[in-house]
């Protein structure tokens, strides 16, 4: 069994294009889970609304129309496309910088560091502003007097109004929890994927510069998604609260953590874990599979 890896630098443009296509496809397919997760995180503790994500999706679609579960979807797709492109570009670039100069191997620790760097990069460049728009739109849709929905102004004008109202500081409010979440997400997700992929390649004596089969890639990506959800959910909940329309009630990220814990309890940090699990399991499988396939096509 070979213990050596062939160093394979990924072309930056190919990495960005493959990541962007994977991100766009994943966003279109999994958005209802993202919608349900965000709504569950915004539901008041005293509310009698169902906490079952499938029931929430069904009732929302039934009472408000199927389009209601895609509120904020355009912003999410654009953000996810940019995010995934930046993520894989950053990960592959940092990964190649951290490889062992003699063997081309990337240790588990270095894989986590590469994921951490990619997560920080994507959080500032793409995730924070687009997540702020998505969260505000979902929150606004459920309010008694929606400002950015059902006003006859159209999607583009409503999005523009929201961006103007929030301003730069509003779009980047919550950048700390977003950066913490994305850094943790990608450190766990990409680090886990890279490590398991390497173990499989070592076990099967497969070349390190070739992707796994589509089935294995999907399974490894899905498993990485499961690990990511439960280890980073508290950061995701705080991020959502800091980007909601009521975010001004929290003076800082730490104050948000403390307030949720004091007023709603520890379990609240994992509210929305089930739909997020559904999305990230699918997301992990879809993103890594499409990414690997597109890289092969572009090679």
From Swiss-Prot:
Solcar repeat spans: 10-97, 109-199, 212-297
Keyword Transmembrane helix: yes
Spans traversing the lipid bilayer: 16-36, 66-86, 113-133, 174-193, 215-235, 272-291
Signal peptide: none
Recorded GO MF terms: citrate secondary active transmembrane transporter activity; tricarboxylate secondary active transmembrane transporter activity
Topological type in the membrane: Multi-pass membrane protein
GO cellular component, as recorded: mitochondrial inner membrane; mitochondrion
GO biological process: mitochondrial citrate transmembrane transport; transmembrane transport
Disulphide connectivity of cysteines: none
Primary location class: mitochondrion
Source species, domain of life: Eukaryota
Coiled-coil residues: none
UniProt keyword annotations, A-Z: Membrane, Mitochondrion, Mitochondrion inner membrane, Repeat, Transmembrane, Transmembrane helix, Transport
Alphabetical list of Pfam families matching this protein: Mito_carr (PF00153)
UniProt-annotated location(s): Mitochondrion inner membrane
InterPro entries: Mit_carrier, Mitochondrial_sb/sol_carrier, Mt_carrier_dom_sf, TXTP-like
Entry's family note: Belongs to the mitochondrial carrier (TC 2.A.29) family.
Role, per record: Transport of citrate across inner mitochondrial membrane.
Protein name: Tricarboxylate transport protein
Species: Saccharomyces cerevisiae (strain ATCC 204508 / S288c) (Baker's yeast)
Lineage: Eukaryota, Fungi, Dikarya, Ascomycota, Saccharomycotina
Gene (UniProt): CTP1
């Amino acid at each position: 069994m070979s213990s050596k890896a062939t160093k394979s630098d990924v072309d930056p443009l190919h990495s960005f294009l493959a990541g962007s296509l994977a991100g766009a496809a994943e966003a279109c397919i999994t958005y209802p889970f993202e919608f349900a997760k965000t709504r569950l995180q915004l539901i008041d503790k005293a509310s009698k609304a169902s906490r079952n994500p499938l029931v929430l999706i069904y009732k929302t679609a039934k009472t408000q129309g199927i389009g209601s579960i895609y509120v904020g979807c355009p912003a999410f797709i654009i953000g996810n496309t940019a995010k995934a492109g930046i993520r894989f570009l950053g990960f592959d670039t940092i990964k190649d910088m951290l490889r062992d100069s003699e063997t081309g191997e990337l240790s588990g620790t270095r894989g986590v560091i590469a994921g951490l760097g990619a997560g920080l990069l994507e959080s500032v460049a793409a995730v924070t502003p687009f997540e702020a728009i998505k969260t505000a739109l979902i929150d606004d849709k459920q309010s008694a007097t929606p400002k950015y929905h059902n006003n006859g102004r159209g999607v583009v004008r409503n999005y523009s109004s929201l961006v103007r109202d929030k301003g730069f500081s509003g779009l980047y409010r919550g950048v700390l929890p977003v950066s913490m979440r994305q850094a943790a997400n990608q450190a766990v997700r990409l680090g886990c994927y890279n490590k398991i992929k390497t173990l499989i390649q070592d076990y099967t004596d497969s070349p390190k510069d070739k992707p796994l089969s589509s089935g294995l890639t999907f399974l490894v990506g899905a498993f990485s998604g499961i690990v990511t959800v439960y280890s980073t959910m508290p950061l995701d909940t705080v991020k959502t609260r800091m980007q909601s329309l009521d975010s001004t009630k929290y003076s800082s990220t730490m104050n948000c953590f403390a307030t949720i814990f004091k007023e709603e309890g520890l379990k609240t940090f994992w509210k929305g874990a089930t739909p997020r699990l559904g999305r990230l399991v699918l997301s992990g499988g879809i993103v890594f599979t499409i990414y690997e396939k597109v890289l092969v096509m572009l090679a």
